[in-house]
Amino acid sequence: MNDIANLCELVGADVNMVRKGIGTDSRIGSKFLYSGCGYGGSCFPKDVKALIHTAAKFGYDMRVLNSVEEVNEKQKNILFEKFKNYYKGDLKGRKVAVWGLAFKPETDDMREAPALVLIKSLLNEGCFISVYDPVAMEECKRRIGDVVTYSQNMYDAVIEADAIFHVTEWKEFRMPSWGVIKKAMKDDPVLIDGRNVFSAADLEGITYLKIG
């Protein structure tokens, strides 16, 4: 679905409409047809790699799974690329907020999490980063130390920020007070939504960038 989302951006289509259309086919369904900023965790990446490796041992090229892995690694960079394109490469010194660190909600697991890829890219460009996750803060400290600022909550993270990255779809992030958030941020703020859960119409004038 991520490839479809990226194509939608190029041709001017809305991936959410495409997803709904595909999902009406009972042979497919709509439950897992969501684009995003990549998968992580301990199971799915390991299982895909194991299948590719096992097939290679027996001389078989798992072309579909190789493509899945390639697309996923590319997708983990998509939020940063949107940010870079939005500011036309002028990133040094910008402050950003990262909402969500774990690879999925309801866990502190950050193994192969998209947030780690994003944070590394932002640091390389000289950005100042405030992060917040309901349960993964200690795990993040263990992994990357004090190279980012650890915020008390989602509102604290956005103070004086140029941009927000929504990386993990925690329920806590779903219905914030956008008016409060906009006032706390710098002029012309932007939200880059890695899970496509928000609507531009609700954001009180915050620029909205989604996937697809």
Regions found by a protein language model. Name each.
Residues 1-212:
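Structural/interface elements that position substrates and couple domains in central-metabolism enzymes
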